């Protein structure tokens, strides 16, 4: 069964279904849940070049994750929050390895079938290719 659940979220309303599923799964499995957010690094700029900008984004992200975590603690689920700066798919995989996640629960949005190879660029697709643990995609 799943003992450690990683839940990468982008702090939008689109995460509600994945949060709902991870809350239920965490409660049933008595799992430890890690809520994880990646502040996407601006390509071509090192994190040090925009330190104040990233610091503000990290602070707001931690506050938002903290509010989200309250729903888990209210149900008796052990939850922790992590935030970092980087490329989302790569950082999600690193977090999964670091936390020894048994499963990743993440949202997936609809891809326009008219756009060739559109799905190849999605974060969930990249995580699926790079990660060794199971991934539960929630729509």
What name fits each language-model region?
Residues 3-48:
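Small/aliphatic-rich secondary-structure junction motif
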Residues 34, 80, 136:
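Conserved beta-strand positions in the Rossmann-like core of class I SAM-dependent methyltransferases
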Residues 37-38, 107-109, 139:
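Short secondary-structure boundary segments
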Residues 50-54, 98-100, 122-123:
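Short, hinge-like loop/turn segments at secondary-structure boundaries
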Residues 52-63, 117:
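A short acidic, glycine-rich active-site loop
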Residues 70-104:
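Structural beta-alpha unit
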Residues 106-129:
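Glycine-rich, Arg-bearing micro-motifs that act as flexible, cationic patches
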Residues 128, 133-138:
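Short, flexible loop segments at boundaries between secondary-structure elements
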């Amino acid at each position: 069964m799943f003992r450690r659940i990683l839940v990468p979220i982008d702090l939008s309303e689109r995460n509600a279904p994945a949060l709902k599923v991870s809350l239920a799964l965490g409660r049933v499995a008595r799992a430890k849940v890690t809520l994880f957010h990646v502040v996407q690094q601006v390509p071509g700029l090192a994190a040090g070049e925009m330190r104040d900008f990233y610091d503000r984004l990290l602070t707001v992200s931690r506050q938002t994750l903290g509010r989200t975590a309250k729903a888990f603690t209210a149900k008796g689920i052990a939850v922790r929050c992590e935030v970092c700066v980087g490329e989302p798919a790569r950082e999600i995989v690193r977090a999964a390895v670091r936390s020894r996640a048994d499963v990743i629960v993440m949202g997936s949005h609809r891809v326009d079938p008219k756009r060739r190879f559109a799905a190849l660029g999605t974060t969930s697709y990249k995580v699926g290719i790079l990660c060794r643990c199971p991934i539960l995609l929630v729509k």
